[in-house]
Design a protein with these regions (language model features):
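ATP/NTP phosphate-donor binding region
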Residues: 1-86, 308
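Solvent-exposed alpha-helices and their adjacent loops that cap or buttress functional pockets
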Residues: 2-4, 24-26, 79-82, 103, ...
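Short glycine/serine/threonine-rich phosphate/pyrophosphate-binding segments
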Residues: 17, 40-44, 94-101, 119-123, ...
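A short, small-residue-rich loop immediately preceding and capping a beta-strand
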Residues: 79-102, 106-116
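A glycine/threonine-rich phosphate-anchoring loop and its flanking beta-alpha core
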Residues: 104-197
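Active-site segments that bind and position negatively charged phosphate/pyrophosphate groups
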Residues: 189-301
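C-terminal charged capping/lid subdomain of soluble metabolic enzymes
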Residues: 287-362
Length: 362
């Protein structure tokens, strides 16, 4: 059985925040805007004017920065007395996840407005919840994907370049993970088989990022969107998001379980973690040295890590084994063409760190 899921509508371009009123009125007449205070101050005037013109009543609810049960309860208490038709998340991944949790409790329509392109959470129905010490406590799901994703590339172009690098890292891995899921016969996050469309999107995402990644980072350095940035934002947010949910994930994302358990890598952005995970996965796939070396050059050109040290790691061999052990315990590690043990991950990490590739090793 094939299952493919996606947002109902996706809008991207320079200045599209001014269109939010006419987009929201398709979904309802009242909205809660969940955003950190700094983000809200930056764009509230445009949103308010657009909503007033469209006849959409809006209210800002402050997001305090962490996706905890307590924060979700606080957000819920702020709007439960007058339940809105729509919850609009404005900001990064944490704001979006907290808003997804709120939307699920309110049974409202869901809109995401990412202000950065560091990951593909805006299109997905999945959200994560942490405890007060930032330990993962739950991975939960909305009943469906967001009703609308709206991405203003003028705003994205003004964010720090490292955030776009992280988005490139999160996107570039998807082709290889979806391909592994196909080879392993694994299900996607919807519980069905990955489709030809999901694989095509993953490959288009990779091709776009390889072609336009460096130019898009140059656009961010200038603070002005251009065609390269438009292409890369579409790849990082839309193509990558559709590919991972409908195609599946593998070793790159399994590595985040291990990397998040050791000092240094644990503090790295998700997209940087999974990018390093791709180098490990390519070694496990026994890719040719020339292919891996080419990937490493692309990583260096786009601000992605080519070693554990570049993720902030300064640990021991015992820490490397911890990374490996937690990686093979992650559910996504089963989505690989053969069964793996911790020793396989250690060997692949050592190959990445030393440059002594595993291709041709029995």
């Amino acid at each position: 059985m094939i299952v493919f899921g996606s947002p109902h509508r996706y809008v991207q371009g320079p200045g599209v925040v001014a269109l939010i009123g006419e987009e929201l009125v398709r979904l309802g007449r009242s909205a809660i805007f969940v955003a950190e205070d700094g983000i809200w101050r930056m764009i509230s005037a445009q949103i308010t004017a657009s909503c007033q013109q469209a006849g959409v009543a809006g209210q800002h609810v402050r997001f305090d920065g962490e996706v905890t049960r307590a924060e979700i309860d606080r957000l819920y208490a702020a709007c439960v007395s007058k339940v809105p038709d729509i919850v609009v998340a404005i900001g990064g991944g944490k704001t979006i996840d907290a808003s997804k949790a709120l939307c699920t409790r309110l049974r409202a329509r869901m809109v995401t407005m990412p202000t950065i392109a560091s990951n593909d959470s805006p299109t997905s129905h999945i959200f994560v919840i942490y405890d007060e010490d930032h330990r993962l406590v739950a991975v939960e799901r909305m009943p469906a994907n967001p009703d609308l994703v709206i991405v203003d590339t003028v705003i994205v172009a003004q964010a720090p370049a490292i955030l776009l690098s992280a988005g490139i890292g999160d996107g570039v891995v998807k082709q290889f993970e979806v391909e592994q899921c196909h080879r392993a016969g694994s299900n996607n996050v919807f519980g069905g088989r990955g489709s030809i469309a999901a694989l095509a999107l993953a490959r288009a995402c990779y091709d776009t990022l390889r072609r336009d990644g460096s130019a898009a980072l140059a656009a961010v350095a200038r603070g002005t969107p251009d065609s390269a940035l438009e292409n890369v934002v579409e790849a990082c947010v839309l193509m990558s998001g559709l590919a991972f949910e409908s195609g599946g994930l593998s070793i790159c994302h399994a590595m985040t379980r291990g990397l998040s358990a050791v000092k240094g890598p644990a503090q790295a952005l998700h997209g940087l973690q999974v990018a390093y995970g791709l180098l490990v996965q390519l070694e496990l796939e026994r890719r040719e040295a020339a292919f891996i070396d080419d990937m490493r050059r692309f990583f260096a050109a786009t601000g992605l890590p080519v070693s554990l040290g570049e993720l902030g790691f300064n640990g021991t061999s015992a820490d490397v084994f911890t990374i490996a052990e937690l990686t093979v315990q992650a559910p996504h590690a089963r989505n690989f063409e053969r069964s793996l043990v911790a020793g396989d991950i250690v060997a692949a990490i050592e190959a990445v760190e030393t440059g002594r590739h595993l291709a041709g090793v029995a």
